[in-house]
C-alpha cells in the first residue's frame, strides 16, 4: 500500500511539472520579448535600421538568391549603403539596368540614406567578375522616377560596366 501511495504522489507531481512546463512553452511571450531586443539592437547599432530597410526593399524587388552582401558606412549621420548582388548567367545590360532602376526608385523613400551603391557580380567566360557598378546619392535617386532606366548611366554619380557584358 505504501508503494502505491508513493507512486501516486510521484505521478501527480510529475504531471504537474509537465503541465507547468508545457504551459510555459505555449504561453510565454517570445515574440514580444524578441521584438524588444531587436528594437534595442537597432537603436544601439548605427546603420542597422537602414540595412534592414534596404534588405526588405531588395526582397520585394528581387529574389533572395541575388543578395550577396550589404555594407553600411556612416557619413555625416547618414548611411552610405553598398549592396552586392549576384546576376544570373543570362544577365544583359538592359536587364541589370531595369533591376537597378526598380531598386533605386523604391530606395528614394529611405531618408537615412546618403548614397546607395549597387554592385552586380556574375560569371562571364567562366570567371567571376563585376558586371556593373552604379552609385546614386539620395538627391539623384529622387530624380529617377521621372526618368527611364536608359538614363541611369548619365545620371549616376558612378557608373561602370564590364566591357565583356553582352558580347
Which residues does each predicted region cover?
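Short, non-transmembrane amphipathic alpha-helical segments
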Residues: 91-114
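Short, low-complexity patches enriched in S/T/P/G
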Residues: 1-9
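Polar/charged, Gly/Pro-rich intrinsically disordered segments
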Residues: 57-82, 113-167
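Hydrophobic membrane-insertion alpha-helices, especially the h-region
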Residues: 9-25
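Intrinsic-disorder-associated interaction segments
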Residues: 43-47, 51, 89, 134, ...
Amino acid at each position: 500500500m505504501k508503494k502505491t501511495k508513493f507512486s501516486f504522489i510521484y505521478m501527480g507531481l510529475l504531471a504537474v511539472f509537465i503541465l507547468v512546463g508545457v504551459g510555459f512553452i505555449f504561453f510565454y511571450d517570445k515574440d514580444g520579448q524578441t521584438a524588444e531586443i531587436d528594437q534595442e539592437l537597432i537603436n544601439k547599432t548605427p546603420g542597422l535600421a537602414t540595412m534592414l530597410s534596404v534588405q526588405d526593399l531588395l526582397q520585394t524587388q528581387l529574389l533572395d538568391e541575388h543578395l550577396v552582401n550589404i555594407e553600411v558606412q556612416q557619413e555625416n549621420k547618414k548611411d552610405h549603403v553598398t549592396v552586392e548582388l549576384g546576376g544570373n548567367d543570362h544577365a544583359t545590360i538592359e536587364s541589370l539596368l531595369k533591376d537597378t532602376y526598380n531598386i533605386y526608385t523604391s530606395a528614394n523613400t529611405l531618408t537615412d540614406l546618403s548614397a546607395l551603391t549597387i554592385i552586380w557580380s556574375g560569371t562571364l567566360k567562366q570567371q567571376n567578375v563585376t558586371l556593373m557598378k552604379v552609385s546614386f546619392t539620395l538627391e539623384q535617386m529622387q530624380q529617377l522616377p521621372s526618368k527611364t532606366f536608359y538614363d541611369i548611366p548619365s545620371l549616376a554619380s558612378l557608373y561602370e560596366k564590364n566591357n565583356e557584358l553582352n558580347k
